[in-house]
């Protein structure tokens, strides 16, 4: 019943959140100090497409009364908050491909500022629909060879996928005190805009360069401290070129492993 009333994007989010919370163990904090900061680029597009077809073929009275809450971008984060009773800030970040990373950074800030003791954060997406695929294909963002090859000389686009990833962030001292299984520590985050184009990065990757520099400054680290770079790596000609230039600008000629998942 719940599944029928939630878009696949929300279903992915709840499944991933369940796994993350199970791994973290019970959060022994005041619910008003547990937040949910979530990211998505599009939200419930699949439901919207399906209901548009229903409207056209069967009439307006057959459109689901759950359409609006199912298609809203904040549905996934809200669903997590409601399922677990988290009463802290429940906010959604919708910044395209950067949404989940922005959400994690914002979540870490809430803890650093003392507003929250824990925040469930991450992102979910389920936009591999017929209309979205057509749109991405017509803007030549998808690979014509059906192979995603980030940073390869023959790259020609990406392949659409769906899924979710969720983390449980806590204050370090509180996580240690309760014996939590700690997998990583967030030491810095940053965001900015290159103010260039809605789908293309600024030439030379100057926006990405500045963002990485700001993140290093926030963390109190030097570029020489970084041992791995998790790149955007969309396998598109424009992005990968600009991103490679940005990485070189920040890290120089150092041989730092670069991955793109």
Please report, for each region that a protein language model flagged, where it lies by residue.
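Conserved small-residue
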Residues: 17, 36, 80, 100, ...
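Condensing-enzyme catalytic core mediating Claisen C-C bond formation in acyl metabolism
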Residues: 147-221, 227-228
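Conserved active-site "lid/cap" helical segment
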Residues: 1-34, 211, 215-223
């Amino acid at each position: 019943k719940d599944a029928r009333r939630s878009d696949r994007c929300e279903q992915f989010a709840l499944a991933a959140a369940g796994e993350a919370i199970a791994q973290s163990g019970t959060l022994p904090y005041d619910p008003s100090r547990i937040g949910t900061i979530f990211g998505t680029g599009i939200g419930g597009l699949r439901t919207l497409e399906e209901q548009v077809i229903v409207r056209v073929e069967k009439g307006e009275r057959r459109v689901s009364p759950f359409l609006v809450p199912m298609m809203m971008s904040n549905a996934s984060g809200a669903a997590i908050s409601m399922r677990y009773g988290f009463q802290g800030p429940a906010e959604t970040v919708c910044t395209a491909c950067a949404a989940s990373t922005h959400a994690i950074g914002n979540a870490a800030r809430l803890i650093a500022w003392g507003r929250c003791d824990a925040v469930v954060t991450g992102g979910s997406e389920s936009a591999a629909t017929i209309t979205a695929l057509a749109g991405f294909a017509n803007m030549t963002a998808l690979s014509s060879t059906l192979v995603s090859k980030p940073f390869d000389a023959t790259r020609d686009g990406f392949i659409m996928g769906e899924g979710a990833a969720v983390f449980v962030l806590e204050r370090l001292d509180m996580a240690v005190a309760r014996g939590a299984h700690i997998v990583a520590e967030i030491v810095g985050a940053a965001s900015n805009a290159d103010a260039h184009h809605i789908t293309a990065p600024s030439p030379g990757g100057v926006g990405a360069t500045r963002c990485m520099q700001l993140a290093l400054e926030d963390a109190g680290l030097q570029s020489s401290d970084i041992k791995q770079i998790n790149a955007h790596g969309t396998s598109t000609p424009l992005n990968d070129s600009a991103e490679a230039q940005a990485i070189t600008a920040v890290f120089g000629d150092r041989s730092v492993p670069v991955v793109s998942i």
